[in-house]
Amino acid sequence: MLIDTHCHLTMPDFEADRSAVIQRAIDAGISHMITIGTDIEDSKRAIALAEGYEFIYAAVGIHPHDARDITDIENVSDTIKKLASKKKVVALGETGLDYHYMHSPAEIQQEHFRLEINLAKSLGLPVIVHSREAKEDTLRILKEEKVEVTGGVLHCFSGDMDMAEKALNMGLYISFSGVITFKNAKKMHDIVKAIPLNRILIETDAPFLTPVPHRGKRNEPAYVKYTAEKIADIKGISLEELGKTITDNAARLFRLII
């Protein structure tokens, strides 16, 4: 039994065969999925999808790429609160900082990041954090806003060991994607070895970051098993032991009843 803790099932990539994608995940032993909103409308779609399946949950929030499109932050805050009150919503996000593409100015990204951390704290929900080429600002804001009050996860982790250790010290989980299966991922392998198993999550970030052996094709939740197999190999444990522990981790963070 495995959980894909971060996928984007509402994206147009899945429009033609979404039901089949979900069924393939179930057939592959994926017991639960969390589909992630990237803006207000996508968050609404994520909730609607989750409400149609007992084993799918949703997260709501504003991706740093989309932060630039928000003109009325107070209204957005109220809307996120309302969406987050829905039964199938288990986290806020994804939110955070992306300085690689800089689709939104850094100061706007930071403002929305702080907003969503504080919303998460007020709602008692964990926060799903996106951080790319923004290590120092990400860690600084997480510390200043006391993320440990509500908890959360660094999704699709691409940082270094120092970042991982500081995140762990703030009570965060670290989530690994299909990147861990790539040939050039030795740095990530070393980080996986060093992190306690009870603080690791796995994800696909589908339709992105497809793991080997399907790299280059569209990703989907069924493929999270390849990430799980690689981490089990790195840790020197059975896939069954890994699956049980990581499922327990996800249930604990997202308050899931499994």
Spans of model-derived segments:
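Mid-domain alpha/beta scaffold segments of enzyme catalytic cores
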Residues: 1-258
